[in-house]
Amino acid sequence: MTELITLAAATPMFEVTDKVLVFSAAFCAIALAAVGSAWGTGAAASSAIGAWKKCYAQNKPAPFQLMIFAGCPLSQTIYGMILMFSIMGAELTKPGIWIFYMITGVLSGIAIGISALWQGRACAAACDAFSETGKGFANQMVVICIIETVAIFVMAFSMVLLSSFAK
């Protein structure tokens, strides 16, 4: 914040406005990714809790692996954070360039967030299946990681786009 105040005193208005809008774009990247992570972890955690309840009711041991499933969608927040830092490092070479960063931040954040949401749904199904059978953990993780790959691709391609645009 102090950086923006100092910047405002020494630069023309459009540069300050552009910088504020780029920082807003950066926040969109992490915020939208985090919304998806929250939704996904909520779905997976709810399923894990229900599966543990079934295990306790049947006097079966509660599998720890369900905690792994419940936490999987959190990684998309990290991808949003990495993208946020990439956008914050933007060089504002021309007035109005902020729109490029805003579109990248918003669309990337949405895509990463949707990946987390669907990963959470898959993790919820994995919790149910694994708690009942005690089998298939590796296969379930592979399928869950396929969904994760979408978020990694979005982050990587967005960063390539950001770096090529800055040239």
Set out the residue ranges of the language-model regions.
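Hydrophobic, small-residue-rich transmembrane alpha-helices and their short perimembrane loops
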Residues: T2-K167
